[in-house]
């Protein structure tokens, strides 16, 4: 009787072990997790049918949906441009004939020395163009892009064949079409 029970337990163990060995965790993930299709992408670039299947295979979630994952690029943030700076051009003329070396007259006529040829009191624009600040770069674990020619221009002025190729290089799209972007 004890031998029959031991053989029965051994047979049940073999059947259970043999029928469930499919996932990395040692279980039949399909039986355990079901067939619902809520796709998730793992950090290793594999698309799983649902989160349970992913966890059953000891993988970690990267995003919802099919692979590859794309994070939408954060908006480009610019620092404000400084105001236009006015630089008047005072000119002091000295008359070398005087002995005491004091200025004989002060003349506010435009001088042609050390200044660009801009009329007096015209604004001389001074801009400090900052580089774009990217907070988030698109994530590409496995770059497989189509050969479509939907040109995009990135913030660094490069034209790519399509947005997927730009994202593979970690570049954010500034506008559709070839560079330079028309405003």
Curated annotation (Swiss-Prot):
Q: Name one GO cellular component term.
A: extracellular region
Q: Which InterPro entries match?
A: Kazal_dom, Kazal_dom_sf
Q: Which residues form the Kazal-like domain?
A: 23-69, 137-181
Which locations, inside or outside the cell, does it occupy?
A: Secreted
Summarize tissue expression. Answer: Component of the acid-insoluble organic matrix of the calcified shell.
Gene3D superfamilies in alphabetical order: 3.30.60.30
Signal peptide range equals 1-18
Q: Which UniProt keywords apply?
A: Repeat, Secreted, Signal
Q: What is this protein called?
A: Insoluble matrix shell protein 6
């Amino acid at each position: 009787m004890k031998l029959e029970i031991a053989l029965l337990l051994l047979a049940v163990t073999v059947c259970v072990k043999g029928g469930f060995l499919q996932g990395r965790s040692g279980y039949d993930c399909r039986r355990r997790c079901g067939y619902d299709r809520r796709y998730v992408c793992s950090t290793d670039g594999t698309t799983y049918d649902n989160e349970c299947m992913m966890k059953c295979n000891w993988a970690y979630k990267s995003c919802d949906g099919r692979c590859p994952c794309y994070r939408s690029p954060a908006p480009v943030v610019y620092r404000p441009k400084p105001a236009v700076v006015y630089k008047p051009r005072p000119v002091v003329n000295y008359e070398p004939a005087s002995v005491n070396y004091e200025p004989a007259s002060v003349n506010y006529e435009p001088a042609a020395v050390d200044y660009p040829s801009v009329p007096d009191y015209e604004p001389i624009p001074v801009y400090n163009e900052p580089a774009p600040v990217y907070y988030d770069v698109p994530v590409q674990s496995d770059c497989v892009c189509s050969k479509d020619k939907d040109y995009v221009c990135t913030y660094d002025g490069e034209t790519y064949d399509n947005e997927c190729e730009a994202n593979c290089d970690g570049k954010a799209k500034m506008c559709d079409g070839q560079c330079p972007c028309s405003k």
